[in-house]
Amino acid sequence: LPTYPMEQLAGWKAQLAERGVPIFDFGTGDPREPTPAILRQAMFDGTHEVSQYPPTQGTKPLRQAVSGYLRRRFGVAVDADTEVMATLGSKECLFHLPLTFVQVPSDKDLVLYGEPAYPVYEIGALFAEAWTYPVPLGVHNGYALDPDALPEAVLKRASVVFLNYPHNPTGFCLPDSLFRRWVEVREEYGFVLVSDECYVDLHYDGPRPRSLLEFGKKGCLAVHSLSKRSGMTGYRSGFVAGDKDLIATYKRFRASMGTAPQEFVQAAATVAWTEPKHVEERLAVFAAKRAVLLELCRQRGLRVHGSQAGLYLWVEVPDGTDGVAYAQRCREVGIVVAPGAFFGRGQE
């Protein structure tokens, strides 16, 4: 396996620190704003005198809080007992889903996703010994993963398909028409359709991002995280919701892995999914920072693609260079950025 991109960024920052160079870190999505006090207090209150193993699926109060969030935010009804599961953030869940649902060898041994992409989709597929099928996304297709642009033979082989909108790292959102089309195609070909929705509450321009579960639940899973939304990157807390049969299968897998979140973290997460004010306050902070950076890019003649949502700006490098070389030039003066190549082949 290649070195995980964020580990490379950590190495770069360590080198700069050793040289005494002031670091301006724009490379890792790890907010510096304090975790809201209401969530920290909930974690403290959730620490009991007697410590016991947490339930695999998550505590009932947390699952009920998630169900309430999905109803309020998307108008989606999910059963807290059968259609929701707590996770250790989103990364471990996204990594484990190919291991859970891809059967190798078989005639459905392929994991499909758009590229640029969160590296975990590919890495999870490789650990599952599945074939990967990254679909190039770009200006030519509006960074929108379209099933009708894919060969039928690929769709037939697909076991797991990852959608990721708002898109990491570009911030593009998927039109409703393509969400509907993916649900239709999933019904025809029978793959597991996974929607990584970690940035769905961090939007700035245009209509509010949608959830896959608004368009269908059968064969579908939506994965959410509290990391950026609620400033809980170090807590490792999220959830997966959707088709009850898929949740049941995944629960059996997770029971063997022993990956249930700690109960005191689940106590904080219960409040985070229930209380919306802190999300609005954090979004205002991110929007202000985004405005500063967009203006800086405009002044410098740098073109920004997408970035309607999420925590990142997808910036086109100047003509005559590439993303890796440009990131190196930035790093020489202490500015740490992630080159597009970290998110896929030919991504500059």
Range-by-range predicted roles:
Residues P2-G89, C93-H96, A272-T274:
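N-terminal small-domain helix-loop-helix segment of the aminotransferase-like
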Residues L16-R19, A128, E188-Y189, R300, ...:
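Helix C-cap/helix->beta junction micro-motif
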Residues S51-E184, D201-L202, P207-G216, L221:
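Conserved core of the PLP fold type I
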Residues T270, F286-L294, V304-E316:
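Conserved glycine-rich beta-strand-loop-beta hairpin in the small C-terminal domain of fold type I
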Residues L213-A287, E295-C297:
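Conserved core segment of the aminotransferase class I/II
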Residues A14, R303, V315-E348:
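Conserved C-terminal alpha-helix-loop-beta "cap" of PLP-dependent enzymes
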